[in-house]
Amino acid sequence: MKHVDIFTDGACSGNPGPGGWGAVLRYGDVEKELCGGEADTTNNRMELLAAISALSALKSPCEVDLYTDSAYVKDGISKWIFGWKKNGWKTADKKPVKNAELWQALEAARDRHKVTLHWVKGHAGHPENERADELARKGMEPFKKGKAVSF
């Protein structure tokens, strides 16, 4: 099974507002960069889309180390999702889970691979996380100008 390192980030100008996501995928010496965005979104949605898009870009099952600066993504997929599923995608206080469709997509993308999640401190000089942040801002830029783009 191939081993891939993935670094993801999301960005939003206003929350909600125009947003973008970015991901760096590394397999040995080969790197691939992905980014995209939406006109009206939240930072959490962009963080989720970064992870979903990166995992979905892998053509075959892989052993993945996924690095995110989002405790929301890390805790959601590794802790909270079990209760949400048991409760019919409701929170402990019976409210609908926010971004349920993205959590379901992330779970499906994750389940194709052997994924280990890692939390990294954002904006702390971690080179790949900084690059993912640059890609997220690049993905957001067209939406700040009213255009759509995905790379």
From Swiss-Prot:
GO terms for molecular function: magnesium ion binding; nucleic acid binding; RNA-DNA hybrid ribonuclease activity. Keywords: Cytoplasm, Endonuclease, Hydrolase, Magnesium, Metal-binding, Nuclease. It is found in: Cytoplasm. The keyword Nuclease applies. It catalyses: Endonucleolytic cleavage to 5'-phosphomonoester. It comes from the Bacteria. Residues 1-141 form the RNase H type-1 domain. Its EC number is 3.1.26.4. GO terms for biological process: DNA replication, removal of RNA primer. HAMAP family: RNase_H (MF_00042). Belongs to the RNase H family. PANTHER family: RIBONUCLEASE H1. NCBIfam families: PRK00203.1 (NF001236). This is Ribonuclease H. It comes from Rhizobium johnstonii (strain DSM 114642 / LMG 32736 / 3841) (Rhizobium leguminosarum bv. viciae). The lineage of its organism: Bacteria, Pseudomonadati, Pseudomonadota, Alphaproteobacteria, Hyphomicrobiales. The gene is rnhA.
